[in-house]
Amino acid sequence: MKKILLLLLLPILSFSQTLVPSSVHIYLDQYMSETSWDIKDTTGNIVAADGPYYNAVNYQSMIIPVMLPAGNLTFTIYDSYGDGLNGALWGGLDGSYYVKQCNDTLVFGDVPNFGFDTAHAFGSDACPPVLGCMDP
């Protein structure tokens, strides 16, 4: 009976998706309510999204923890005004953005004048094991 139950559950277990702890770092300019972002899989499904940041303060750092599936993904950041995170254009400070996973930076957004949006393709994968003795 246990073998039959295991055989029935095996297809369900084999389709379970590996989720990897990650984080999206958004360093806003002074027009924070214009900024939003999403992460999509290869079929266009949104797997994570946030913004616009109506309640943020100028230049606030937003660190959003997300669980991302393993595989190829696309991070897209949006600016509803069309000047990106280019706050210096209007006498302020520029913003930036990053996607991090397993202490690696997968998306590095240091060009603030991206217009209405910009997309970055990246690969998400399980974190490698930490090597070495873990006993104190």
Placement of each model-derived feature along the sequence:
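Residue-level recognition of alpha-helix boundary/capping or hinge positions
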Residues: 1-136
